[in-house]
Every structure is written in structure tokens, then in C-alpha cells.
């Protein structure tokens, strides 16, 4: 893909995103990684000084109890399965170091994907502010 445009639940000043409030973050991440440019459109409530929980998780149903123990503190969402049949949960712990947390979550058996999107994926963020918008560029090609 040349260009992918999507929203975000949180946008940090350094370009880290939390996505997946709707439970489709695995597919969203695949599409964003496949695109040459990934542009996020957000309203003025989405930029945050620092990321915080909850961070969406997609988990395998097999070994769910063990996976939940390893990613604690976390809770299961009372929602349907993801588009690919995964169980949707939320991580509620600290997100002060999103890079380390992303590695930890990605390395946990049973975690299909998490909703942390690193800044190297993000080309630009457009933040709507009433009748205008601010553009924040994160990588070349914007």
C-alpha cells in the first residue's frame, strides 16, 4: 500500500500510539506495517503527555489463564472475539516505557498482538482542533 489512514486511541509526543479500542489492532498493525506511509487522524482528545492503560491485547484462547497471569495486570473484555477469533483483553499496568512493554508483551506466549504502535511506523498525525488541524511529522515521506 502507498498510504494507510487510521485513527488512534492515544498519541504520545514521541509518536508512540495506543490503538485497538475496537479490538481490530492486529489487522490494523498488519495494514500499517504494509503501507509506505501511515497517517493517523485524531481529534484533540487523543494526544496525551504520556501513554497510559488500558492497552488492548489480542490473545489466544488456548492457555488463556496462563497468558493472563503473565501479562498482569490485565482484564478480559466482555466483547465478541476479534475478527480473527482472538480473545480481547486490556493491559492495565504502567506504560512509562512503551518500547520495553511492547517487547515484553510480544514475547509472551499466547499474546497474538498488542495495541502499542511504535513511532517508526507513523508517518504523520493530523489532530483536528475545531475548524483547523495540526500536523505532526514523525518520519520522512510524509
PLM regions: where:
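Conserved phosphate- and dinucleotide-binding cores of soluble alpha/beta proteins
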Residues: 1-142
